[in-house]
């Protein structure tokens, strides 16, 4: 019971008809209670003497009579609360309780757990002295015994009234239905290679010990090849050197008193496949060769992952892989070198790897040089001619008298256009006050030390054989203020 102090004890089971004195528990140095013989002079609190049984009362199943309780005293504690049977097995039982409602004026010294066999009248303490725990496990009980249990709270003034279980506790074999717990890695096909060992450990549950049996594909196991060892909680199947004949479904059956549980495990023993049965060079054209082959007769007891195709030049004899894990049985090998002769071979592949041998073409693939005639195309010269168009127009500008200023624009044309600058529609070329520059399509007009007289509308015109274009802007030269 979680959160409670616990104690364990072992109880001897003397025969009631024997003349020996009754056995009572004693405390070992370890703190646990072991069985030992008592002469009735133990220092533990004396059990209450039962009253004589009524002859008319049942002899076997009646609860043993207890002494008539004395009126409760304020010095002794009251009876413990909620005495509960927690667990029973074939050789032990566990009980728990809660502290009494009243501990008495002198305080609590501990609890005394007592048992009385069904049909007997003597209450025997489990511990030689009171223990400060609220849960105890009594061990070493005989199968088939029935006990009444009670617990008493004890103080220095004496023992209080007991708390008693209403029904006797029957010590009996616990039956647990069989159940097999297959490990996760065995829930899918278990694959091993030929020659490897197979060692399967399958846990199971069931009480008492169940009967275990194995079958292979519905038949009994071959004891010369397969070894089985079963314990109380698991069964081990072992094959020292697995062969392909060991593949199949192994079924584990656990029987217990008319109940059974079954689990199946699929084992697949594989090996490398054989090579393809045949290979044929179908055709050779240009720098290409077409191949075809047939699947192997032996796949290694498992599915093929594909084929590996290799080529080798006759001059070097070195093999190079062209295709890996290729599933079809026909392929075309491209990018072969002109003038070389090639051989081809194909391997089969499964989970164990490539086949030890490969199937090779008998004939060579000769890559011949073909006659090539060059037919040059007629050169068509592109016409880049274009009428003038301004890609960047002139922008209006404001200048200060006495400081040179510049106007910019850019033009696109082919052939190169003629650039003409004008002021107020009048050509200003040749005027030393202006300097015009045109380079890489960028047109610049510099006005040296302008005055208010130079204000006006400036125009840049571009002319070639395909047309002309022009852009305008306004220049304003502000006179300086006079004082």
Swiss-Prot record:
Q: One GO CC term of this entry?
A: myosin filament
Matching CDD domains: FN3
Q: Which organism is it from?
A: Mus musculus
Q: Which gene encodes it?
A: Mybph
What protein name does the entry list?
Myosin-binding protein H
Question: Where are the Phosphothreonine residues found in this chain?
Answer: 2, 6, 26
> Which residue numbers delimit the Ig-like C2-type domain?
178-266, 388-472
Signal sequence: where?
Answer: none
Provide ranges: composition bias, Polar residues. Answer: 1-15
Low complexity: bias regions: 41-66
Enumerate the Gene Ontology biological process terms. Answer: cell adhesion
* PANTHER family documented for this protein: STRETCHIN-MLCK, ISOFORM U, TITIN
Statement: the UniProt record of this protein carries the keyword Phosphoprotein: yes
Protein function: Binds to myosin; probably involved in interaction with thick myofilaments in the A-band.
